[in-house]
Amino acid sequence: MSHQMAPWIPMFIQSCKNNTEPFVSFQFATVDELTNKPRCRTVVFRDFLFHDKRTNVLTFNTDMRSSKITESFITPNSNNSSDSKRCETPFFEACFYFPETWEQYRFSGQCFTISKQFKKIPAEIVTKYDIFSPRFSETNDDSTDEEIDTPINDDDDDDKNNDADNNDINEDNKLIESIENDEHHEDEDDYYPQPQEWEAELLRQWSSLSRHTKSLYRKPAPGQKLTSETSKQLDKLHRGVDGAKEDAGLENFGIVCLCVDSVDFLNLKEGRGGERWIFQKTDGKDEDLWEEQEVCP
Protein backbone atom coordinates (compact mmCIF):
# COMPACT_ATOMS: atom_id res chain seq x y z
CA MET A 1 0.00 0.00 0.00
CA SER A 2 1.33 3.45 -0.95
CA HIS A 3 -0.01 6.84 -0.04
CA GLN A 4 2.28 9.45 -1.53
CA MET A 5 1.90 13.13 -2.19
CA ALA A 6 1.98 14.22 -5.83
CA PRO A 7 4.93 16.45 -6.82
CA TRP A 8 2.67 19.39 -7.71
CA ILE A 9 1.09 19.55 -4.25
CA PRO A 10 3.85 21.64 -2.51
CA MET A 11 3.77 24.19 -5.35
CA PHE A 12 -0.01 24.43 -5.19
CA ILE A 13 -0.02 24.79 -1.40
CA GLN A 14 2.53 27.59 -1.61
CA SER A 15 0.44 29.38 -4.23
CA CYS A 16 -2.60 29.17 -1.94
CA LYS A 17 -0.54 30.52 0.97
CA ASN A 18 0.60 33.46 -1.16
CA ASN A 19 -3.00 34.29 -2.00
CA THR A 20 -4.26 37.28 0.02
CA GLU A 21 -7.93 36.90 -0.88
CA PRO A 22 -10.25 35.44 1.80
CA PHE A 23 -11.11 32.53 -0.49
CA VAL A 24 -9.35 30.55 -3.19
CA SER A 25 -11.85 30.39 -6.02
CA PHE A 26 -11.49 28.54 -9.29
CA GLN A 27 -13.39 27.54 -12.43
CA PHE A 28 -14.86 24.04 -12.56
CA ALA A 29 -16.00 22.62 -15.90
CA THR A 30 -17.84 19.43 -16.86
CA VAL A 31 -19.99 18.23 -19.75
CA ASP A 32 -23.77 17.96 -19.45
CA GLU A 33 -24.58 14.24 -19.67
CA LEU A 34 -27.87 14.90 -21.45
CA THR A 35 -26.94 17.62 -23.98
CA ASN A 36 -23.17 17.04 -24.29
CA LYS A 37 -22.69 20.79 -23.80
CA PRO A 38 -19.84 22.12 -21.65
CA ARG A 39 -20.76 23.68 -18.31
CA CYS A 40 -18.50 25.95 -16.25
CA ARG A 41 -18.93 27.72 -12.92
CA THR A 42 -16.84 29.42 -10.23
CA VAL A 43 -16.49 27.52 -6.95
CA VAL A 44 -14.39 27.80 -3.78
CA PHE A 45 -11.57 25.43 -2.85
CA ARG A 46 -12.26 24.05 0.63
CA ASP A 47 -9.66 21.47 1.59
CA PHE A 48 -7.93 18.26 0.62
CA LEU A 49 -10.03 15.14 1.11
CA PHE A 50 -9.84 13.91 4.73
CA HIS A 51 -7.73 17.03 5.43
CA ASP A 52 -4.77 15.11 4.04
CA LYS A 53 -2.77 16.52 1.14
CA ARG A 54 -1.38 13.06 0.35
CA THR A 55 -4.77 12.01 -1.00
CA ASN A 56 -4.04 14.41 -3.89
CA VAL A 57 -7.81 15.06 -3.98
CA LEU A 58 -9.13 18.64 -3.99
CA THR A 59 -12.62 19.39 -2.68
CA PHE A 60 -15.30 22.05 -2.84
CA ASN A 61 -18.80 22.23 -1.37
CA THR A 62 -22.05 22.31 -3.30
CA ASP A 63 -25.82 22.22 -2.94
CA MET A 64 -26.92 18.78 -4.12
CA ARG A 65 -30.03 20.35 -5.68
CA SER A 66 -27.94 22.54 -7.99
CA SER A 67 -27.72 22.13 -11.74
CA LYS A 68 -24.09 21.01 -11.64
CA ILE A 69 -25.26 17.82 -9.92
CA THR A 70 -28.15 17.03 -12.24
CA GLU A 71 -26.06 17.87 -15.31
CA SER A 72 -23.01 15.75 -14.57
CA PHE A 73 -23.38 13.47 -11.56
CA ILE A 74 -26.74 11.77 -12.14
CA THR A 75 -27.32 9.44 -15.08
CA PRO A 76 -30.19 10.72 -17.26
CA ASN A 77 -33.46 8.81 -16.72
CA SER A 78 -31.97 6.98 -13.74
CA ASN A 79 -34.58 5.08 -11.75
CA ASN A 80 -32.38 4.39 -8.75
CA SER A 81 -34.01 4.83 -5.37
CA SER A 82 -32.53 7.33 -2.93
CA ASP A 83 -31.12 4.50 -0.84
CA SER A 84 -29.26 2.91 -3.74
CA LYS A 85 -28.56 6.01 -5.81
CA ARG A 86 -25.12 5.80 -7.34
CA CYS A 87 -22.80 8.75 -7.78
CA GLU A 88 -21.40 9.10 -11.30
CA THR A 89 -17.73 9.98 -11.85
CA PRO A 90 -17.62 12.51 -14.69
CA PHE A 91 -14.47 13.93 -16.22
CA PHE A 92 -13.68 17.52 -15.31
CA GLU A 93 -11.27 20.34 -15.88
CA ALA A 94 -10.54 23.00 -13.26
CA CYS A 95 -8.54 26.21 -13.54
CA PHE A 96 -6.99 28.14 -10.65
CA TYR A 97 -5.42 31.55 -11.32
CA PHE A 98 -3.48 33.51 -8.71
CA PRO A 99 -3.25 37.11 -9.99
CA GLU A 100 -0.69 38.30 -7.44
CA THR A 101 1.87 35.68 -8.43
CA TRP A 102 0.73 35.25 -12.05
CA GLU A 103 0.38 31.50 -11.58
CA GLN A 104 -2.16 29.25 -13.22
CA TYR A 105 -3.00 25.60 -12.51
CA ARG A 106 -5.16 23.59 -14.89
CA PHE A 107 -6.29 20.28 -13.39
CA SER A 108 -8.05 17.47 -15.23
CA GLY A 109 -9.32 14.09 -14.09
CA GLN A 110 -12.47 12.51 -12.68
CA CYS A 111 -14.68 13.62 -9.82
CA PHE A 112 -17.32 12.25 -7.47
CA THR A 113 -19.54 13.54 -4.68
CA ILE A 114 -20.04 12.74 -1.00
CA SER A 115 -23.50 13.47 0.38
CA LYS A 116 -26.46 12.08 2.27
CA GLN A 117 -28.10 11.40 -1.08
CA PHE A 118 -25.29 9.34 -2.59
CA LYS A 119 -24.72 6.50 -0.17
CA LYS A 120 -22.33 4.57 -2.39
CA ILE A 121 -18.96 5.89 -3.57
CA PRO A 122 -17.93 4.00 -6.75
CA ALA A 123 -15.21 1.52 -5.83
CA GLU A 124 -13.51 1.89 -9.21
CA ILE A 125 -12.61 5.55 -8.67
CA VAL A 126 -11.41 4.87 -5.12
CA THR A 127 -9.04 2.14 -6.26
CA LYS A 128 -7.98 3.96 -9.44
CA TYR A 129 -6.76 6.97 -7.47
CA ASP A 130 -5.58 5.03 -4.40
CA ILE A 131 -7.82 6.88 -1.95
CA PHE A 132 -6.93 5.16 1.30
CA SER A 133 -8.76 5.20 4.61
CA PRO A 134 -7.94 8.19 6.83
CA ARG A 135 -7.07 5.68 9.55
CA PHE A 136 -3.77 5.12 7.79
CA SER A 137 -3.01 8.75 7.03
CA GLU A 138 -3.71 9.81 10.61
CA THR A 139 -0.69 7.88 11.81
CA ASN A 140 1.57 10.22 9.84
CA ASP A 141 2.59 13.60 11.20
CA ASP A 142 2.18 15.27 7.79
CA SER A 143 -0.97 17.35 7.48
CA THR A 144 -2.22 20.51 5.86
CA ASP A 145 -2.31 22.30 9.23
CA GLU A 146 -0.26 25.50 9.21
CA GLU A 147 0.57 24.90 5.55
CA ILE A 148 -2.53 26.14 3.81
CA ASP A 149 -5.28 28.37 5.14
CA THR A 150 -8.34 27.28 3.21
CA PRO A 151 -11.81 28.66 4.00
CA ILE A 152 -12.94 25.32 5.44
CA ASN A 153 -12.78 26.93 8.89
CA ASP A 154 -15.05 29.90 8.26
CA ASP A 155 -16.85 29.92 11.61
CA ASP A 156 -18.20 33.21 12.86
CA ASP A 157 -18.51 34.28 16.49
CA ASP A 158 -22.20 33.35 16.64
CA ASP A 159 -21.36 29.68 16.13
CA LYS A 160 -19.68 29.51 19.53
CA ASN A 161 -23.07 29.91 21.20
CA ASN A 162 -24.78 27.17 19.22
CA ASP A 163 -24.82 24.43 21.87
CA ALA A 164 -28.51 23.63 21.40
CA ASP A 165 -28.17 23.10 17.68
CA ASN A 166 -24.90 21.21 18.03
CA ASN A 167 -26.59 18.65 20.27
CA ASP A 168 -28.46 17.45 17.19
CA ILE A 169 -25.28 15.99 15.69
CA ASN A 170 -23.69 14.63 18.87
CA GLU A 171 -24.37 11.13 17.66
CA ASP A 172 -22.58 11.94 14.41
CA ASN A 173 -19.59 13.25 16.35
CA LYS A 174 -19.50 9.98 18.28
CA LEU A 175 -19.34 8.23 14.91
CA ILE A 176 -16.24 10.23 13.98
CA GLU A 177 -14.60 9.41 17.33
CA SER A 178 -15.34 5.70 16.95
CA ILE A 179 -13.72 5.69 13.51
CA GLU A 180 -10.61 7.45 14.81
CA ASN A 181 -10.25 4.85 17.56
CA ASP A 182 -10.85 1.86 15.27
CA GLU A 183 -7.68 -0.16 14.75
CA HIS A 184 -9.28 -3.23 13.18
CA HIS A 185 -8.30 -3.50 9.51
CA GLU A 186 -7.20 -6.88 8.29
CA ASP A 187 -8.69 -7.25 4.80
CA GLU A 188 -7.29 -5.51 1.74
CA ASP A 189 -10.62 -3.72 1.27
CA ASP A 190 -10.11 -2.10 4.67
CA TYR A 191 -7.31 -0.04 3.16
CA TYR A 192 -10.01 1.98 1.44
CA PRO A 193 -12.50 4.29 3.18
CA GLN A 194 -15.50 2.58 4.74
CA PRO A 195 -19.04 4.04 4.45
CA GLN A 196 -18.87 5.56 7.92
CA GLU A 197 -15.60 7.29 7.03
CA TRP A 198 -17.15 8.98 4.02
CA GLU A 199 -19.98 10.09 6.28
CA ALA A 200 -17.50 11.37 8.85
CA GLU A 201 -15.76 13.48 6.19
CA LEU A 202 -19.12 14.94 5.17
CA LEU A 203 -19.78 15.89 8.79
CA ARG A 204 -16.26 17.28 9.27
CA GLN A 205 -16.62 19.74 6.43
CA TRP A 206 -20.20 20.59 7.34
CA SER A 207 -19.30 21.25 10.98
CA SER A 208 -16.56 23.64 9.91
CA LEU A 209 -18.97 25.93 8.08
CA SER A 210 -20.28 29.15 9.60
CA ARG A 211 -23.90 29.55 10.63
CA HIS A 212 -24.51 31.82 7.64
CA THR A 213 -23.00 29.36 5.17
CA LYS A 214 -25.07 26.51 6.60
CA SER A 215 -28.22 28.58 6.17
CA LEU A 216 -27.59 28.75 2.41
CA TYR A 217 -28.40 25.04 2.20
CA ARG A 218 -31.87 25.68 3.66
CA LYS A 219 -32.83 28.06 0.87
CA PRO A 220 -35.27 27.07 -1.87
CA ALA A 221 -33.58 24.91 -4.49
CA PRO A 222 -31.15 26.83 -6.72
CA GLY A 223 -32.85 27.80 -9.99
CA GLN A 224 -36.35 27.42 -8.54
CA LYS A 225 -38.83 30.02 -9.78
CA LEU A 226 -39.01 33.08 -7.55
CA THR A 227 -42.55 33.36 -6.17
CA SER A 228 -44.13 35.16 -3.25
CA GLU A 229 -43.66 32.00 -1.18
CA THR A 230 -39.98 31.52 -2.02
CA SER A 231 -39.42 35.26 -1.49
CA LYS A 232 -40.83 34.90 2.02
CA GLN A 233 -38.54 31.94 2.68
CA LEU A 234 -35.49 33.89 1.53
CA ASP A 235 -36.46 36.89 3.64
CA LYS A 236 -36.88 34.76 6.76
CA LEU A 237 -33.49 33.15 6.17
CA HIS A 238 -31.89 36.55 5.68
CA ARG A 239 -33.35 37.74 9.00
CA GLY A 240 -32.54 34.45 10.74
CA VAL A 241 -36.15 33.73 11.68
CA ASP A 242 -36.96 30.80 9.39
CA GLY A 243 -37.50 28.54 12.42
CA ALA A 244 -35.34 25.70 11.13
CA LYS A 245 -32.50 24.13 13.07
CA GLU A 246 -28.99 24.92 11.91
CA ASP A 247 -28.32 21.42 10.59
CA ALA A 248 -31.54 21.21 8.60
CA GLY A 249 -29.57 21.94 5.44
CA LEU A 250 -27.24 18.97 5.84
CA GLU A 251 -29.46 16.86 3.56
CA ASN A 252 -28.71 19.27 0.72
CA PHE A 253 -24.99 19.59 1.44
CA GLY A 254 -22.41 17.81 -0.67
CA ILE A 255 -18.66 17.63 -1.25
CA VAL A 256 -17.31 17.39 -4.78
CA CYS A 257 -13.98 15.54 -4.84
CA LEU A 258 -11.55 16.18 -7.70
CA CYS A 259 -9.22 13.27 -8.50
CA VAL A 260 -6.40 14.64 -10.61
CA ASP A 261 -4.84 12.90 -13.63
CA SER A 262 -2.83 15.79 -15.03
CA VAL A 263 -1.70 19.28 -14.06
CA ASP A 264 -0.63 22.10 -16.38
CA PHE A 265 1.26 24.68 -14.29
CA LEU A 266 2.10 28.09 -15.78
CA ASN A 267 4.15 30.75 -13.98
CA LEU A 268 4.33 33.99 -15.94
CA LYS A 269 6.40 35.86 -13.33
CA GLU A 270 9.34 33.51 -13.51
CA GLY A 271 12.39 34.69 -15.48
CA ARG A 272 13.05 33.81 -19.11
CA GLY A 273 9.54 34.80 -20.10
CA GLY A 274 7.83 32.44 -17.71
CA GLU A 275 7.90 28.71 -17.02
CA ARG A 276 5.48 25.87 -17.62
CA TRP A 277 5.40 22.32 -16.27
CA ILE A 278 3.18 19.37 -17.17
CA PHE A 279 2.54 16.71 -14.50
CA GLN A 280 0.97 13.47 -15.71
CA LYS A 281 -0.22 10.64 -13.47
CA THR A 282 0.86 7.15 -14.55
CA ASP A 283 -0.03 3.80 -13.03
CA GLY A 284 2.97 2.03 -11.52
CA LYS A 285 3.02 -1.61 -10.46
CA ASP A 286 2.78 -0.90 -6.75
CA GLU A 287 2.08 2.82 -6.61
CA ASP A 288 0.98 5.81 -8.63
CA LEU A 289 3.79 7.65 -10.36
CA TRP A 290 3.95 11.14 -11.81
CA GLU A 291 5.87 12.20 -14.88
CA GLU A 292 7.14 15.79 -14.90
CA GLN A 293 8.08 17.66 -18.05
CA GLU A 294 9.08 21.30 -18.49
CA VAL A 295 7.64 22.76 -21.70
CA CYS A 296 7.65 26.10 -23.45
CA PRO A 297 5.32 28.58 -21.70
Curated annotation (Swiss-Prot):
GO cellular component, one term: cytoplasm
Gene3D superfamilies documented for this protein: Electron Transport, Fmn-binding Protein, Chain A
Listed InterPro entries: Pyridox_Oxase_Alr4036_FMN-bd, Split_barrel_FMN-bd
Molecular function GO terms recorded: FMN binding; pyridoxamine phosphate oxidase activity
Pfam families xref list: Pyridox_oxase_2
Start and end residues of each stretch annotated as Disordered: 136-174
Biased composition (Acidic residues): 139-170
More info: Present with 2840 molecules/cell in log phase SD medium.
Sequence similarity: To S.pombe SpBC725.03.
Name of the protein in question: Uncharacterized protein YGR017W
